[in-house]
Amino acid sequence: MRKIILASGSPRRKELLELAGVPFEIIVSEVEETIGAYSSPSDIVMSLALQKASAVAENNSDHIVLGADTIVTYESRILGKPSNEAEAKEMLQLLSGKTHEVYTGVAIIAKDKTVTFYERTEVTFWELTEEEIDAYIASKEPLDKAGSYGIQGKGSIFVQHIQGDYYSVVGLPISRLVRELKQFNIDVTHA
């Protein structure tokens, strides 16, 4: 039987696959992510997810490889992972009291088929005080997350409203993924 391989070292993606009962192994993609001239955030996340999955699939062609990528956007500006605490603070100040978009792209590669898709979720933050932002940054939680927050952690207290898939904001639209895996004859709903 073909194995499912997650081409990511993200603990959040690992947890979501485990939560859904998807059997998998992890092989972290070492690909250098490159963003070309793309017209939309959805194109970017699907391309990056495909780059990650393709790099792992090269040496695992008999298996199904999953790649994923998440970005946060606000007014056409892409907010990736902050490079330092000052950048994290700038991002959180930018998002304070506003609605932003989170895009997660997924690529599923097998020998006979490749599927890519994305989910877009709108997230609205409460107005944040400087003290709230500074305390959150001091926790170190935002430093490895796109947009400088983790909706599944302490960053959850900043969220006023969400429209779309919560799990996509965490890093993997698990409900959609499980449905897409059926195209590869993988059905975890009966496991």
From Swiss-Prot:
In short, the EC number is: 3.6.1.9
Q: Which UniProt keywords apply?
A: Cytoplasm, Hydrolase, Nucleotide metabolism
Q: Which CDD domains match?
A: Maf (cd00555)
UniProt KW Transport keyword:
no
Q: Which InterPro entries match?
A: ITPase-like_fam, Maf-like
* Main localization of the protein described in the UniProt heading: cytoplasm
What does this protein's UniProt record list under function?
Nucleoside triphosphate pyrophosphatase that hydrolyzes dTTP and UTP. May have a dual role in cell division arrest and in preventing the incorporation of modified nucleotides into cellular nucleic acids.
Q: What is this protein called?
A: dTTP/UTP pyrophosphatase
State the organism of origin. Answer: Bacillus cereus (strain ZK / E33L)
Gene that this sequence comes from: maf
